[in-house]
Amino acid sequence: MKLLGLVFLLFNLFMFSFSRKLLTESGGGLHDEAALLKLKSSFLDPNGVLSSWVSDSSSNHCSWYGVSCNSDSRVVSLILRGCDELEGSGVLHLPDLSSCSSSKRRLGGVISPVVGDLSEIRVLSLSFNDLRGEIPKEIWGLEKLEILDLKGNNFIGGIRVVDNVVLRKLMSFEDEDEIGPSSADDDSPGKSGLYPIEIASIVSASVIVFVLLVLVILFIYTRKWKRNSQVQVDEIKEIKVFVDIGIPLTYEIIVRATGYFSNSNCIGHGGFGSTYKAEVSPTNVFAVKRLSVGRFQGDQQFHAEISALEMVRHPNLVMLIGYHASETEMFLIYNYLSGGNLQDFIKERSKAAIEWKVLHKIALDVARALSYLHEQCSPKVLHRDIKPSNILLDNNYNAYLSDFGLSKLLGTSQSHVTTGVAGTFGYVAPEYAMTCRVSEKADVYSYGIVLLELISDKRALDPSFSSHENGFNIVSWAHMMLSQGKAKEVFTTGLWETGPPDDLVEVLHLALKCTVDSLSIRPTMKQAVRLLKRIQPSRL
C-alpha cells in the first residue's frame, strides 16, 4: 500500500496489519540519528526524497530534510512534505518528539501500545484514516498530551472517562455508537426509581428556577443599560487623537469623508475589517479601517489594546493618528499612502523592470519594522499576518507595515502565546498552524514567504504549482530550482541582469532560511536586517 504524505510521522504509534516486519529498537540508549537512519532503511524511496539522510562528518541529523531538533540536538518534529512516493514501514524511538500529525492519509492497522514511549508528545492527530481495533490504554499515560484527534476512523468502542487525564482539546469519534454509556435501558420508571408525580415536580421546579434566572439577568442588564445610556450618548461621537495634524477631527468629519463608508471609497478588505479612503481636504487624506465590532469583547478591551500601542512608533510602521470606539462602531484612523500595497506592486511590475535597489529597499524597510516590533517594543508585538497586502508603499517606494495594531501583545516574560490561528493561508508558519502556538519566529516565516514573492514571479501558492504534490508552495519551488542549479530562474524578469548575482543569491538564501521548519535555525528579524544592510546597494 502506498502511503500518502506524512504517513511516517507516526513512527511507532501504530503497526499496519498488512505492512512489512517492523524494525526493532536497539535499546534505551539509541541515538536519534541512528533511529532516523533505521527509519530510512525501511522505506522504498524511488525519488531520493531522503537522500540527505546520510551519516557523515559534514552535517548532523538536525540539518537533514524535514528534521527539526531542540537545543540538545534531539528530534522534536519530523515533517516530510512532498513524500508521496515513500513506501514501507518502520518503528522509530524519538522520546523528545512533541508534535505528530497525519490526517486524511489512508493509514490503516492498529495503534501500537508503544505509543506510551512518546513521553513528550503534545499534539497527536490521526483523524480520517482507516485505523482499527481498540485505542491502547497507554495513550492515557501521556501526561503532556494536549490535543488528541482520532475522529473518522473505525475503532472498536468509544472514549471512556479516564482519571487524571486533562486534554486541552479532545476530538475523538464521529458517528460512533459507544461514546459514553448507553441509556436505552435506563428510561423506564421502574429502574429510575421515580414515580410520575415526582418527575413532574422536578420538571416544574426546574422551569421555575430557569424563569427566575432569566428575570434576574434581564433586571441586571436593564439597570446597567440605563446607567450607561447617558455616557454612551456623550461618548458615541468622540474621536481620540494621538497626533496633531493641524485640523480638528470629529466623528462627523471622518464618517462624511468616507462617504459614510461607501463602497466607492473602500480601498481594501482584511481579517479585521474594511479600509476606506477619507479625504477631509486636499492636504489631509486618511485611511480609515472600520473594524468588526464582534472581534472585541466590548469597547473596554479595545481601549486597552489601543492604549498599549499608542507609543508604538517607527518610520516603517503606518502611523496611527487616532481612533473611535463605542459599542456600535469602531474604527482606526491612519495616514493615507498613495503608493498602494505590495500585492498590487508585485502584480503590476511586469509592465516595467524594477531595479534591484527598489526591491532591496522594500525588503529592508519591512525587516526593520518587524525587528522593532520584536526587539524594541515592551511588551513585544507579534504581527501574525505578514503578507503583501499588509505592506503599504508611498510614491518613493518606502514601505510601511500595517495591521500591527491589533496583533497579540506578549508580556516580557513570555516567548510565545497559545491562541487561535490568525494569518493568511500560504503565509502561516507550519508550527503555528499545527499547534496554535505563535512566537516571533512565525512572523519570520511569513517574512520569508513575502521575500520570495518580492524577488520572483511566483505567489505563495502559485497556480503553476498545481501539477505538483499537495503541500508544494513557493518554498518547495525555490528549493527545487536551487537543487537543479537554476538559481537564476528564481528571480523576476531582468533582475538577475541588473542586480549583483552574489547579492541576489544571498537574499534568496535568507528567504529560505526564514522558512525552515526548525525555529532554532530561523534567524531573528534583527539578524535579517543586519544581512540586508551588509549587501545594501550603494545608490539609494
UniProtKB/Swiss-Prot annotation:
Superkingdom, taxonomy of origin: Eukaryota
Effect of disrupting the coding gene: Decreased sensitivity to ABA during germination, growth, and stomatal closure. Impaired central domain protoderm patterning defects, and defective cotyledon primordia cell types.
Stored InterPro entries: Kinase-like_dom_sf, Leu-rich_rpt, LRR_dom_sf, LRR_N_plant-typ, LRR_Rcpt-Like_S/T_Kinase, Prot_kinase_dom, Protein_kinase_ATP_BS, Ser/Thr_kinase_AS
Encoding gene, per UniProt annotation: RPK1
LRR repeats: 118-142, 144-169
Cleavable signal peptide: 1-19
Protein name, UniProt field: Probable LRR receptor-like serine/threonine-protein kinase RPK1
Extracellular compartment segments: 20-198
GO biological process: abscisic acid-activated signaling pathway; embryonic meristem development; longitudinal axis specification; radial axis specification; response to abscisic acid; response to cold; response to salt stress; response to water deprivation
Protein source organism: Arabidopsis thaliana
Catalytic residue positions: 385 (proton acceptor)
Organism phylogeny: Eukaryota, Viridiplantae, Streptophyta, Embryophyta, Tracheophyta
